């Protein structure tokens, strides 16, 4: 048996990256939160100096691009939307994109992202302004995404000594990037830190007031590249862990983004012999339908099946019900294709496969090993961490409990674990609205330390040890 229900309101409504939030009926002067950086960026002392009325804050993720429209004078957030990064056609992760650049296809990647930004701008501006009225665009992303967007040489990002083509804040006109409707906009990319820790990580650090926090503070921006930062009494160290796109639904057999039809939550109710599925509903009163599984559903499924011993500690999925004494409602779902999460009347079942579990293990092991390496570098134990921020569009929609059970998050006191949402996007918005905030990113970029995980001998062993699906 299975019970399917609409995902909780906050899971869907709060999923800013996957919906258009239309606030046409609100005005900047009516909104009491227009100066709240959690809701509308920061209205700075420099806002009155902005020559344009409209600006865009963009988070160019490896898998997902998030864009928000702001009115510059009031600081009001007008609308937001996201789309899958069009560059995924040429590779799911950073290394694949760099490989295509080395093979002479960088111009194609540049064209894809620039066209996508113009298309998204047309959509997000509708009802508010023309794209030609956008005066300022602040874009953040990992170093590779920023280099491709700006047409910079990516050869230094592919191998040791890993050297970016530029450092500091990058500014140019949209026309220099071949933009048409955004040709008059000033395009600004805040400073990054190193070849694999980019402007998005700096935006996270800045938006969380990371450097001013007392004690030991850790932040993990979970995405295709998990960027990790550790501040110990003002000393900042960073690294980038290649998590892969599994958390965003990519490279999963029936994976998808967090949109209508996605399984966003999984619970196994042994006492009633049911599997409970939380499914993201469509608009209005459309009936629920199940199409696949998104990142939060993947974590829940792995956690639930691990607790029932359908998945072993090493990540192996049971091949036969006879291997464990399972209740019939679980045993009947073990098939040659994998574990049947959803049984469709039309035969369009949704499975969790062995490959899916391996993709999860690779992603979570990368994050765990990266965190452990930074802690070791600063000679800090996990118990000494005062606050752990989990950032990223994906990070705001997962179960803390299941993330800890599977070993994605460390097992620390619940009050120390803070879900920060899309902190990179918030940082981009703050940089859009405040020149002072923007300049702060340059200071962070030049003062932060960096650990290149690929060059650390112990990283591979740390990574292999972290593959086990257990709390840590």
Q: Which residue stretches match the model-derived regions?
A:
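Catalytic phosphate/nucleotide-handling subdomain of diverse soluble enzymes
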Residues: 232-234, 380-444
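Glycine-rich phosphate-binding loop and adjoining helix at the ATP-binding site
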Residues: 93, 131-134, 148-203, 247-252
């Amino acid at each position: 048996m299975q019970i399917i229900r609409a995902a909780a309101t906050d899971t869907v409504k709060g999923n800013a990256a996957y919906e258009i939030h239309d606030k046409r009926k609100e005005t900047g002067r009516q909104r009491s939160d227009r100066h709240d950086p959690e809701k509308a960026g920061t209205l700075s002392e420099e806002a009155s100096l902005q020559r344009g009325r409209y600006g865009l804050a963009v988070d160019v993720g490896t898998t997902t691009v998030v864009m928000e429209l702001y009115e510059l004078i009031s600081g009001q957030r007008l609308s937001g939307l996201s789309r899958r990064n069009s560059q995924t056609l040429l590779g799911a992760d950073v290394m694949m994109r760099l490989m295509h650049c080395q093979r002479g296809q960088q111009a194609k990647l540049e064209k894809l992202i620039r066209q996508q930004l113009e298309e998204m701008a047309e959509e997000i501006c509708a009802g508010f302004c023309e794209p030609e009225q956008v005066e300022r665009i602040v874009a953040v992303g990992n170093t590779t995404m920023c280099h491709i967007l700006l047409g910079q040489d990516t050869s230094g990002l592919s191998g040791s000594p890993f050297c970016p083509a530029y450092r500091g804040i990058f500014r140019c006109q949209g026309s220099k990037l071949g933009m048409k409707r955004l040709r008059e906009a000033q395009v600004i990319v805040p400073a990054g830190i190193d070849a694999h820790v980019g402007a998005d990580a700096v935006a996270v650090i800045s938006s969380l007031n990371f450097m001013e926090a007392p004690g030991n503070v850790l932040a993990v921006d979970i995405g295709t590249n998990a960027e990790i930062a550790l501040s110990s009494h003002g000393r900042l160290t960073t690294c980038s862990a290649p998590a892969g796109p599994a958390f965003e639904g990519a490279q999963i057999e029936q994976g998808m983004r967090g949109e209508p039809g996605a399984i966003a939550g999984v619970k196994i109710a042994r006492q009633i012999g049911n599997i409970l599925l939380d499914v993201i509903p469509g608009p209005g009163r459309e009936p629920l339908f199940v199409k696949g599984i998104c990142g939060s559903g993947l974590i829940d499924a792995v956690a639930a099946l691990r607790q029932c011993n359908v998945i072993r500690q090493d990540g192996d999925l049971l091949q036969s019900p006879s291997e464990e004494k399972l209740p019939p409602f679980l045993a009947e779902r073990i098939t040659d294709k994998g574990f049947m999460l959803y049984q469709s009347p039309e035969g369009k079942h949704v499975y969790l496969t062995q490959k899916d579990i391996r993709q999860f293990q690779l992603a979570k092991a990368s994050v765990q090993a990266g965190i452990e390496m930074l802690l070791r570098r600063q000679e800090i134990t996990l118990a000494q961490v005062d606050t752990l921020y989990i950032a990223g569009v994906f990070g705001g929609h997962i179960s803390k409990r299941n993330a800890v059970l599977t070993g994605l998050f460390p097992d620390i006191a619940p009050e120390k674990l803070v879900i920060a949402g899309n902190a990179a996007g918030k940082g981009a918005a703050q940089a859009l609205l405040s020149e002072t905030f923007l300049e702060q990113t340059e200071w962070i970029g030049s003062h932060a330390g960096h650990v290149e995980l690929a060059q650390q001998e112990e990283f591979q062993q740390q990574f292999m040890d972290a593959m086990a699906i257990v709390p840590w």
